[in-house]
Regions:
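A short beta-loop-alpha structural element at the N-terminal edge
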Residues: 2-16
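Conserved GNAT-fold acetyl-CoA-binding loop/helix
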Residues: 15, 19-46
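A short helix-loop-beta-strand connector motif used in the catalytic cores of GNAT acetyltransferases and
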Residues: 43-59, 76
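Conserved beta-hairpin
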Residues: 56-68
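Conserved acetyl-CoA pyrophosphate-binding loop and the N-cap/start of the following alpha-helix
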Residues: 86, 90-98
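Conserved GNAT acetyl-CoA-binding A-motif
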Residues: 96, 103-116
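Conserved catalytic-core motifs of GNAT/GCN5-like acyltransferases
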Residues: 112-114, 129-147
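Conserved active-site tyrosine of GNAT-family acetyltransferases
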Residues: 123-124, 128
Length: 152
């Protein structure tokens, strides 16, 4: 598996991976209405483009296909998504580990994340602790997530 920095040419593939991952992998934990609010069929490409350009973003590739991506802003892990057919194969750990190392190398003493119900166990296995169970609103729809922290 190849780990590399995100390039703007990756945007469309990342948006497809994000949509499919949310709607397939998180479907056991969230309603269809919640999934649509979290990952609408039509993404705001300019918002995504700007956000990914501002953050340190990595993609994991297998045979030329993006199978995972994640991005961090300092000590905050903003997004981490793994393709539905690559769950449990190490892609998420590869990306998360590299983002944590990047933050640590730049002086961060901790990493925080807002983890979904679906991702909570993944982050707990990586040493993150739940600080708070949260209810957030997306497009008028309430979703549950967890503020989590890992001390380096």
């Amino acid at each position: 598996m190849l780990l590399r920095e995100y390039g703007e040419k990756d945007l469309e593939e990342i948006l497809r991976l994000f949509y499919r991952t949310v709607h397939v992998v998180a479907a056991a934990d969230y309603s269809e209405e919640q999934l649509d609010a979290w990952a609408p069929a039509e993404a705001d490409r300019e918002k995504w483009r700007a956000s990914l350009a501002e953050h340190f973003c990595l993609v994991a590739e297998e045979n030329g296909k993006i199978v995972a991506f994640g991005d961090a802003d300092g000590g905050y892990l903003d997004r981490l998504y793994v393709a539905a057919d690559f769950q449990g194969r190490g892609a998420g750990s590869l990306v998360a580990g590299a983002l944590e190392e990047y933050a640590r190398a730049r002086g961060a003493e901790k990493m925080t994340v807002h983890a979904s119900l679906t991702a909570r166990a993944f982050f707990e296995k990586r040493g993150y602790k739940v600080l708070e169970r949260r209810r957030v609103e997306r497009k008028g729809v309430e979703l549950t997530n967890f503020l989590m922290k890992k001390i380096f």
